Swiss-Prot record:
Function comment: Specific inhibition of calpain (calcium-dependent cysteine protease). Plays a key role in postmortem tenderization of meat and have been proposed to be involved in muscle protein degradation in living tissue.
Cross-link (Glycyl lysine isopeptide (Lys-Gly) (interchain with G-Cter in SUMO2)) at residue(s): 32
Ranges where the record places region Disordered: 1-402, 422-509, 547-723
Composition-biased stretches (Acidic residues): 157-173
The protein, known as: Calpastatin
Biased composition range(s): Basic and acidic residues: 46-84, 195-216, 249-263, 306-367, 378-396, 445-504, 562-571, 586-643, 701-723
Phosphoserine PTM sites in chain numbering: 87, 224, 245, 367, 369, 376, 443, 519, 530, 578, 580
Amino acid sequence: MNPTEAKAIPGSKQLEGPHSPNKKRHKKQAVKTEPEKKSQSTKPSVVHEKKTQEVKPKEHTEPKSQPKHPSDTRSKHAPKEKAVSKSSEQPPSEKSTKPKTKSQDEISGGGKSAVPAVAAAASAEPADKNKESKLLTSAVPVESKPSKPSAKSDMDTALDDLIDTLGEPEETKEDTTTYTGPEVSDPMSSTYIEELGKREVTLPPKYRELLNKEEGIAGPPPDSSKPLGPNDAIDALSSDFTCSSPTADAKKTEKEKSTEEALKAQSAGVIRSAAPPKEKRRKVEEDTMTEQALEALSASLGTRKPRPELDPSSIKEVDEAKAKEEKVKKCGEDEERVPSEYRLKPATDKDGKPLLPEAEEKPKPLSESELIDELSEDFDRSKCKEKQSKPTEKNRGIPGRCPRACARGCASDLHVFCAVSSTHSSSSEGMVPDDAVEALAGSLGKKEADPEDGKPVEDKVKEKAKEEDREKLGEREETIPPDYRLEEAKDKDGKPLPPKEVKEPLPPLSEDFLLDALSKDFTVPSDTSSPQFEDAKLSVVVSEVVSQTPAPTTQAAGPPRDSARDNKELDDALDQLSDSLGQRQPDPDEHKPVEDKVKEKAKAEHRDKLGERDDTIPPKYQHLLDDNKEGTPGKPKRSESPRHQRSPRHQRNLQVPRTPLTPSQGTWTAVPQLQKPQQTQQRTKTRSLLPSDKAPRNGGKAKDSTKAKEETSKPKADGKSTS
C-alpha cells in the first residue's frame, strides 16, 4: 500500500469515532438526506483541530515541510468522493454488518479515553511505514470477522500515531489589496443558442415520428458487468412466490442496508482502497450464503406432489400400414422396351450376315525349360547383340536406352522379368568377368527364331465407318438446278447460233523482215518511182505491227549503203510481203457511230446556261456585246501575246516539211505539199481505217476531227512518199 493510502484510512476511522449517537439514530430511522451528511462530516473536523493544537507543543523534531491535510478541505471534498469510495469498497455480507456496527459503537465510546493516550504517544518517535502497513493489514480482517474487539483496538493506536505525524494547517492570508487600475468593461454580449435536438421540445415533428418508431432499432445490451449478489439472486427467485407474512430476517436485512448506506456516506470522502478481484468476491459471496436463507426459501415453497404412475395397460400400440414395394420396369431395362431406333444392331458382314465372336487365344502354359531359356536370354551376349542390331540404329542418339531396347527385343511374353534382368545385367557388366559370362553362355541352348517377330503390328480395332462417294452439286449437268444452267446463245428468232469460225492466225514474221520494215523510213531506195500500191500496203503492215502512233521526226542518219545489191534484196522482200497480203474489203459498218450497249437509266437533261444564247444574256450586259459588234477592240488573241509568239524558225518548220537525208543528198530538201495528191489521199484513207481512230457521237464534231486529222497526215504522207 502507498503511504498516502495508509494515512487516509485511519483518518476516516477517527472521524467515525465521536459520532456514535448518530449511528444509533440510523438504526431507528431511515437514511438521512445529503445536507445532514455534510453537517456530520464537518463536526469531526473541529474535533481534529482541537487534538492537533494539544499535540503541537510536544512536537519539536518534525520539520515544517511535512504534508498537511486541512480539515476544511477534507469536508469539502467528501461529497465528491462518495462515488469513488462506493465503487472501491468491498460489498459487505448480511452477517458481517451487525458485528461491525457493534464494534464501531464500542470504538466511538472509547474515543474519549483514546485522546490522552494520543498525547502520551506523541512524545515518542513515529513508527516506521512498514509497521503501519502491517497494522493496517491486520486491521482489515478484523473488520470482516464478527468477533468482539477489545476496549482499545490496534486501529486506535494506529490512528493516534498517524495523527501525531500531522502538523498544523497553514493559515491562508487573504489579499486585502484593492485594484486601482482602470475599469475593465466587456462590450461583447453572448447569446445562448440551443442546439437542435438537445431537448425534445426542439425536435421537429417529423423526427419525433421517426424516434417513436422503434422498428429495426437494436436496444442496448444488458449490463452483464454487474454481478448479482446472493441476496439479489434469492430475491429474484423468491419474487414469484407469495408469502403471507414477511420473515424476521427480511426486517433485519432492511436495517442492515440502511446502516451500510449511512456508514458509506461518512467514510466516502477519505477511503481510497483498490477493489478486490472478482474471484475473491465470488468466494466471499459463496461463504456468506447461510443455511437460514436457504431454509427460509425452502419454507416458502410448497411440498412436491408425487407424479402419478403410468399404467402400461392403458398404452395402445399403433399398427402402421406396411408399404409394399412394387418393382416398376424402366424404359430400356429390357430389350423389348428399348425403341427400335435405339436398339443395338449386331455387327454384320458385307453380305449382311452377323459376325461370329472371335475366340480368345489362350496363352500356352510354358514349361520350366522354356522359362529358363527366356530368363537367361539377357545373359547371352551373342543372341542379344543379334536382336539389338535393329533398335540400336534407331537409338544411336540416346545411348542410355540401349539396355532397355535389348530387354524388349529379347523378351516376348514376360516383360517384367526381362526388365529386372536387363537392369541387373547393365549394373553387373563391369563387375562380372568375361570368362564367367562365356561359361554361362555356353551352358545355355540356342533359341529358335520366332516367325512373328518381323511382322508389323496390325490394328485389331475395326472401324465401322465406310466411305461413300456422293455426287456434289454441279458435278454433272443433271445435278445443276435449272435456274443456274448455262443457256445456249440464240438468235432473235430463237434459233441456236452456229459456232464462230476461228480466224487463221497470221504467218509468223521473221526478225529480219521486221527490222527491214522498221528501218525503211531511214533508207531511201534507188528506184524512187515505185508503184503507189506497194507503199500503201507496206504502211498498213507497219502500222499493225508497230504501235499506231507516228514515229518521231529524229535527225539521226541512216545506215550507210554499201552497194546496189542490198537495195535489190530489200525490194524483193517488200515485193514478197506485198504479195502475201490480200486486198482489204471495205466494211459497211465502219463509218457508223459507236453505240453504247450499256443503257443508263439516268437521262441527261439539257439546260440553257446563262449567256449561251442571246435571250439568256441579262440586259445589263447586252450593251457590251453591241459595242464589240460595232468595232470596239475585244480581248486580245492568244497568238498576239509575246509569250505565245513563235520564233521564225518554228513557223518555217510548220510551213515546210522536211525529208530525211539520203546518202546521195547532202542537205535537207523542201518538198512542196501538193506534189502527189493521189498518194496523199490513199495514205489518209489508210489512217482513217485504223482501229485506234474512234468516231465521235455527234456528227458535227466528227467532221471537224476528220478534217484536222487529214491536215496533220498530209505532210507526214508526203515525207514518206519521197523516201
